[in-house]
C-alpha cells in the first residue's frame, strides 16, 4: 500500500464548497482540485487549485489526494487492479488460442 493510500485511510473527507458571498462580488476559493471558472449572475467565481498552495496543512492535502485517488479507482477498469500473475496467465491464454487457431485450418465452405 502506498503512502498516499495510507494517508487516505486516515483522512478522507469530501472537498469543501465555497458558496458565493453575493451575486455581484467575485469569490476566491481554494477547494477545487483544478482551476475552474464558474459564471454567476453578474460576475465570475474563481476557484484555484488547492494543490498549488504550499500553506495547506498535510490533512487538507491528503484529503484532496484521497478524493482524487478514490475517483481514479472508481473510473479504472475493474480488471486493472489484478496482479502481475494475472497478466502472465492472460498472455498464456492468448498464446494458446493463437496457437490453436494456427494449428487448426479453417473449414472449407
Curated annotation (Swiss-Prot):
Entry's localization field: Cytoplasm
Keyword Transport recorded: no
Top-rank taxon, per record: Eukaryota
Principal location class: cytoplasm
Region described as Disordered: 76-109
Coiled coil segments of this chain: none
Expression across tissues: Not expressed in uterus.
Repeat (Sequence) residue spans along the chain: 21-29, 30-38, 39-47, 48-56, 57-65
Keywords: Cytoplasm, Keratinization, Repeat
Free-text function comment from the UniProt entry: Cross-linked envelope protein of keratinocytes. It is a keratinocyte protein that first appears in the cell cytosol, but ultimately becomes cross-linked to membrane proteins by transglutaminase. All that results in the formation of an insoluble envelope beneath the plasma membrane.
UniProt family annotation: Belongs to the cornifin (SPRR) family.
Protein's name according to its UniProt entry: Putative small proline-rich protein 2J
Originating organism: Mus musculus (Mouse)
Amino acid at each position: 500500500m502506498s503512502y498516499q493510500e495510507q494517508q487516505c485511510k486516515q483522512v478522507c473527507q469530501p472537498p469543501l464548497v465555497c458558496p458565493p458571498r453575493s451575486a455581484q462580488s467575485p469569490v476566491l476559493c481554494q477547494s477545487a482540485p483544478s482551476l475552474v471558472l464558474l459564471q454567476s449572475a453578474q460576475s465570475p467565481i474563481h476557484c484555484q487549485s488547492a494543490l498549488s498552495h504550499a500553506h495547506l496543512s498535510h490533512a487538507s492535502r491528503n484529503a484532496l489526494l484521497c478524493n482524487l485517488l478514490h475517483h481514479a479507482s472508481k473510473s479504472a477498469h475493474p480488471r486493472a487492479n489484478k496482479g502481475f500473475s494475472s497478466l502472465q496467465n492472460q498472455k498464456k491464454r492468448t498464446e494458446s488460442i493463437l496457437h490453436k487457431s494456427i494449428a487448426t485450418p479453417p473449414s472449407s465452405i
